[in-house]
């Protein structure tokens, strides 16, 4: 029986092209981690480094937990590294008709303040566990090179990194494989690791859903508690004011941290409120923008990695109340959310272009590209909510002022914006900007 199970596991790895980690504790599914670089024997180093990229939290973080496991095994301290995203080298002003490219857009104050606020929470929490956290600012140095230098200077034995499917992160990790130590990537964002859920890009939710549901009993588990460093470690001081200045943020989009405070504790407070006020009606009223209190409002925390959706799914499932609301919440948070990672993971070159869309969608856009438009609006008009559509304008104003938008209204915005634009390439830039 054991040999049969071993052969089955080997077959899964061969089909997916992924080499899973082998040295795992009982609470860790080996499929969560994949080996990017084997390197030398890790026992010869002086620490284990966890490079935090996407999952900015100290709790319910499989990548951090696995890194701590390795540190304990090798009797070495754990260090956490975060590299601030470099500001664009060149910036473009917003043209009346053509929005700037993504690569030249500054981080907004809204995103930057939320990011830094979350990092400060993580730094404080790790400090209480005697786990040092370093926040680096790349200056005329490639991010991957800075991480490689950090690993070398700290004499790291192993580098653990969390998972992101985005192109620039994939590029960093490809450069990092030149180091002579093991580099292990752990998917701490998806409940079922993206490379294990499916070996191909799925058509849609209907094809991914059965695959996820088959695997969920093994992967939707509780988390162990992160143990403190037992080895003495010096905790570096972080100048958060310097970090703020380094990001060179676009201050035209104000912070909303007072409305939506960052950090895992704030996220769980919001989730507790949703369980008591929204879950019972979530199935029935979640698509009605008149009932905003029914929505969870967890998207900022999930998207910024400040809370694990696996924690939310575990808690709502074990609440054992409101089965219809629970089913709808899990469908959106597991199937629909993990479908997006599947799309980006298996469409690495085109996920942010029209070429990444399904062929029928491309054909439809091409067919209607010459249709007469009753209304056409510039980038400025759309940003300011100056259209003939009162609902569209109101939703844009809400997005600017509150940083949130109901899912049904978001769909309305996208549909109308498609009607009001001739050039679909520019249309995508509109969406990225707004």
What is each model feature region?
Residues 1-230, 325, 397, 416-421, ...:
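Trp/Phe/Arg-rich N-terminal binding region typifying the photolyase-homology
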Residues 2-5, 12-15, 27-28, 43-45, ...:
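Glycine/tryptophan-enriched, flexible segments
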Residues 57-61, 299-303, 403-408:
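Short, conserved micro-motifs enriched in small and acidic residues
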Residues 66, 146, 270, 297, ...:
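Short, hydrophobic/aromatic alpha-helical segments in well-folded domains
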Residues 331, 336, 340-395:
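Aromatic-anchored, charged helix-turn/loop surface patch used as a conserved interaction hotspot
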Residues 341-342, 407, 425:
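Acidic/polar loop patches that form or flank catalytic/metal-binding clefts of enzymes
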Residues 379-422:
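Extended, compositionally biased non-globular segments
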């Amino acid at each position: 029986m054991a040999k049969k199970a071993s052969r089955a596991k080997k077959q899964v790895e061969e089909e997916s092209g992924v080499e899973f980690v082998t040295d795992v504790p009982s609470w860790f599914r080996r499929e969560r981690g994949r080996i990017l670089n084997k390197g030398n024997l890790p026992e010869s180093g002086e620490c284990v480094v966890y490079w935090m990229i996407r999952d900015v939290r100290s709790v319910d973080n499989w990548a951090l937990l696995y890194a701590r496991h390795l540190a304990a095994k090798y009797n070495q301290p754990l260090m956490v590294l975060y590299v601030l995203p470099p500001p664009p080298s060149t910036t473009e002003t917003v043209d009346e008709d053509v929005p700037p490219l993504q690569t030249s857009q500054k981080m907004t104050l809204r995103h930057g303040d939320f990011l830094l606020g979350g990092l400060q929470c993580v730094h404080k929490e790790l400090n209480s566990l005697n786990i040092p956290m370093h926040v680096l600012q790349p200056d005329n140095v490639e991010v991957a090179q800075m991480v490689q230098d950090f690993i070398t200077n700290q004499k790291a034995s192993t580098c653990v990194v969390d998972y992101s499917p985005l192109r620039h992160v994939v590029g960093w990790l490809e450069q990092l494989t030149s180091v002579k130590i093991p580099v292990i990537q752990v998917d701490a964002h998806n409940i079922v690791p993206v490379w294990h859920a499916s070996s191909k890009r799925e058509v849609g939710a209907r094809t991914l859903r059965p695959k996820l549901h088959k695997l969920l009993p093994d992967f939707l588990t509780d988390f162990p508690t992160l143990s403190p460093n037992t080895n003495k470690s010096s905790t570096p001081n972080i100048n958060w004011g310097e970090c703020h200045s380094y990001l060179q943020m676009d201050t035209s989009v104000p912070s909303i941290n007072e409305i939506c405070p960052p950090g895992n504790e704030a996220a769980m407070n919001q989730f507790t409120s949703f369980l008591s006020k929204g879950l019972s009606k979530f199935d029935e009223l979640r698509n009605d923008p008149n009932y905003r209190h029914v929505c969870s409002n967890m998207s900022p925390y999930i998207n910024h990695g400040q809370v694990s959706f696996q924690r939310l799914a575990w808690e709502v499932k074990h609440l054992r109340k409101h089965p219809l609301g629970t089913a709808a919440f899990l469908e959106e948070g597991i199937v629909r959310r993990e479908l997006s990672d599947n799309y980006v993971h298996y469409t690495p070159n085109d996920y942010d272009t029209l070429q990444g869309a399904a062929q029928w969608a491309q054909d439809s856009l091409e067919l209607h590209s010459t249709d007469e438009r009753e209304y056409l609006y510039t980038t400025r008009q759309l940003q300011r909510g100056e259209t003939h559509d009162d609902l569209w304008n109101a939703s844009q104003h809400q997005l600017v002022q509150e940083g949130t938008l109901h899912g049904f209204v978001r769909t309305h915005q996208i549909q109308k914006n498609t009607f009001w634009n001739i050039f679909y390439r520019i249309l995508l830039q509109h969406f990225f900007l707004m």
